[in-house]
Amino acid sequence: MKQLVIILFMSAFFAACGGNTDSNTSTAESSSSDSKKSETGNPSYDPERGEGKFTKVEVAEKLDVAKAAAGEKVYGVKCSSCHKLTSEKLVGPGWLGATDRHTAEWIMNFTTNTDAMLNKDPKAQAQLEICLVRMPNQNLSDDDARNLYEFMRKNDGVK
């Protein structure tokens, strides 16, 4: 009797988990690809800047030590569980060289507008394919994003 109950429970569990049909999947895929086509065809979208409110970030040649220190605190609280300061992937990509690969605007837009960037930006989508996990919204303020960018510059060797 106990085995019968276990078998019935497992059958019900697997039936509940597997409710995806081909028609639902194809509809979701086609609407997703349609939205990607319309978004990437948008002439106002700048892949060097990304999607968000940061259009021009003034970055001094010399590192702002105070901002970098504040950014290191943000990293310790909100970023270090998923990102290493090396090029090694943890959950998300490693940060070494990030400021060489992306503009300040792109990084700050990504950290403050993650979902829109993951839905629209080709570079963010490529990282998502590698990491397989969407970065959750960290609710960073504009100052936190700027300080975090300065810490990333410090990590990349800017003095």
Summary of predicted features, one role per range:
Residues A28-V74:
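Electrostatic cytochrome c docking/interface patches
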Residues Y75-K78, T86, R134, D144:
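Short pre-active-site segment immediately N-terminal to redox-active cysteine/selenocysteine motifs
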Residues E105-F110, V133-K159:
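C-terminal capping alpha-helices of c-type cytochrome domains
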